[in-house]
A protein has these predicted regions:
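Start-transfer (signal-anchor) and selected internal transmembrane alpha helices
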Residues: 35-125, 204, 214-216, 383, ...
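Extracytoplasmic catalytic/substrate-binding loops of multi-pass membrane glycan-assembly enzymes
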Residues: 128-142, 157-169, 331-341
C-alpha cells in the first residue's frame, strides 16, 4: 500500500524557476567556449575612477543611513542590548567597506559602496525586533537551554537539530548580556558581509580586469531580498554556508584546490544543503583542477569540526545523526513552500508520495550525472566559465527536482545566479530575477 497525501497548495513560482533552470543549462550546454568566455565582456571596461564629488555624495549618504540604523538600535526593546548592537553595526560597516577596499584598492569604488552598505545595514536594523514562529518555537528555546545549562557544557546534551558548529555559536553567546534574538541575527549578518565578499571574489575571477562587475556583485548581494530577509528578518543562518560555498568556488577557480575543499567542508558542517554544489568538485578532480589528496581534506575538516563536541561529551551518534534527522523530518511532504516541480501539482490532488519522491530523486541523480558526464567529455578544455555555469546548474536544478525541499534551500541558487547576472546582463539578469521571484514566492 502506498502512502498518499493531498497537496495543500500550488506555488506557480516553480514554473519561473523551471524556465530559469533551463536558461542556465542552455548557457552551459549550447554556447561555444569562445562565447562563454566572452560573456563578461558585455560590460564595458571601466578604467576611470568615479567622479570625486559623486563618490563623496554616496559616501555621505551611506554614513547617514548608518546613523539612521544606529538610531533604530537606540530604540530596541531590550535596553542593555542597544549599545552592543549599535557597535556591531558600526563594525559590520567597517568590515564591509574594508574588505571592498582591500580587494579593489580604488577609493572611489569604496566610497560609492558606502551607500548600498549603509542601506543594507539600515534595512537589517529595521528587522532586528521581528520574531518568527521558527525562532519562537525552536531557536529561542535552544538559546535559553544553553544559558540555563552551563553554556559549553550544554553542547553534550541532545538539544537542537543543527550540526555542532552552530551549537558552538549558541554556547558562546550564552555568556553575553545581550538578547539572543539580536545575537543570532547579528551572526548571520556577519556572514552576509562575508557572502558579499565571496561574490566579489567569484565575479572578479570571471570578469575582465578593471571591471566594476565584482563591486556590483558585492553591493547587490548585500541588498538581495532573500539575503536581507534570511538572517535579519527570519533569524536563519543560510548565509553561513552560502558564504563558505561562494568562497570555496572562488578558491577552486583561483587554483587553490586545498583551500576550496576545506571551505566546502566547513560549509557542509553548517548546512546539509552544501551537497547541491559538491558534485562540482568531482568535475574539478577529473579535470585535474583538484587532486585526490585534496579531496581527502573534506572528511578531515569535517572531523575537526566535531572534535570539540566529542571532547565536551556529545555522543558521536548524535552528531552524525543530525542530517539524517533533518532529512526524515519533512519526508511526509513533497515540498514545503519550495518552488520545486512538486509545487506545480494541483491543489487537492491525491499523490503517491513515495513514488513521486523516488522519481524526483532519480531525476536529480540523472540530471547531476548528465552534467558530470558532459564535463568529463570536455575535461581537456574546461574553462572557468563552464565550471561556474555547471555550479549554477547544480544549485538551481538539484533542489528543483528533489522532494522534501524547503523554500530556503534555494538560497545558494539565489546568490550564484546573482553573480551570473553581474557577469552577463543579457542572460544572467532574467535568470537571477526568475530565481529570486521563485524563492520569495
Amino acid at each position: 500500500m502506498y502512502e498518499s497525501i493531498s497537496v495543500y497548495h500550488v506555488d506557480f513560482s516553480a514554473s519561473s524557476l523551471f524556465v530559469s533552470k533551463f536558461g542556465v543549462i542552455r548557457t552551459f550546454f549550447f554556447l561555444p567556449d569562445n562565447e562563454v568566455n566572452a560573456m563578461s565582456r558585455s560590460h564595458p571596461l571601466q578604467s576611470q575612477l568615479f567622479p570625486p564629488y559623486a563618490a563623496a555624495l554616496c559616501g555621505g549618504a551611506g554614513l547617514l543611513l548608518l546613523l539612521l540604523a544606529l538610531c533604530r538600535t537606540a530604540g530596541l526593546s531590550d535596553a542593555p542590548s542597544r549599545l552592543p548592537v549599535g557597535l556591531c553595526l558600526v563594525l559590520l560597516c567597517a568590515l564591509a567597506a574594508g574588505l571592498l577596499f582591500y580587494e579593489d584598492r580604488r577609493p572611489g569604488a569604496a566610497l560609492f559602496a558606502l551607500l548600498p552598505i549603509g542601506l543594507a545595514l539600515f534595512l537589517r536594523a529595521l528587522c532586528l525586533e521581528h520574531v518568527t514562529y521558527d525562532y519562537r518555537d525552536f531557536l529561542s528555546g535552544w538559546a535559553s537551554f544553553f544559558r540555563e545549562n552551563g553554556g559549553w557544557a550544554a553542547v553534550a546534551l541532545p538539544k537542537g537539530n543543527y550540526n555542532v558548529p552552530y551549537l558552538y555559536f549558541l554556547a558562546a553567546i550564552s555568556y553575553l548580556p545581550v538578547r539572543d534574538l539580536y545575537l543570532i541575527k547579528l551572526f548571520s549578518m556577519l556572514f552576509d558581509v562575508l557572502l558579499a565578499w565571496g561574490g566579489y571574489r567569484l565575479v572578479r575571477r570571471l570578469s575582465v580586469p578593471g571591471s566594476y562587475c565584482p563591486c556590483t556583485a558585492f553591493c547587490i548581494l548585500l541588498l538581495l531580498p532573500t539575503v536581507v530577509l534570511n538572517g535579519a528578518y527570519w533569524a536563519q543562518c543560510d548565509s553561513i554556508y552560502g558564504a563558505l560555498c561562494l568562497h570555496a568556488l572562488a578558491s577552486a577557480l583561483d587554483r587553490r584546490p586545498a583551500g576550496s575543499v576545506v571551505l566546502l567542508a566547513l560549509a557542509f558542517s553548517f548546512k546539509l544543503q552544501t551537497v547541491f554544489l559538491v558534485p562540482l568538485w568531482g568535475a574539478l578532480w577529473f579535470a585535474g583542477r583538484v587532486r585526490f589528496r585534496d579531496l581527502l581534506l573534506f572528511p578531515a575538516t569535517y572531523v575537526l569540526t566535531i572534535v570539540p563536541a566529542l571532547f565536551l561529551g556529545k555522543p558521536l551518534g548524535d552528531i552524525l545523526g543530525v542530517y539524517f534527522g533533518q532529512a526524515a523530518e519533512y519526508s511526509d511532504y513533497l515540498t514545503l513552500n519550495a518552488p520545486s516541480l512538486y509545487a506545480l501539482i494541483p491543489y487537492g490532488a491525491e499523490v503517491d508520495t513515495t513514488l513521486a519522491a523516488r522519481l524526483g530523486i532519480l531525476a536529480a541523480f540523472l540530471f547531476t550525472v548528465s552534467i558530470l558526464l558532459w564535463l568529463l567529455l570536455r575535461r581537456g578544455r574546461l574553462t572557468d566559465r563552464a565550471l561556474f555555469t555547471a555550479g549554477a546548474a547544480f544549485a538551481v536544478g538539484i533542489p528543483l527536482l528533489l522532494p522534501h525541499m524547503h523554500d530556503r534551500y534555494f538560497f545558494l541558487a539565489d546568490t550564484i545566479t546573482l553573480c551570473w547576472a553581474c557577469l552577463d546582463r543579457r542572460r544572467g539578469i532574467p535568470a537571477a530575477i526568475l530565481v529570486q521571484v521563485a524563492s520569495l514566492g
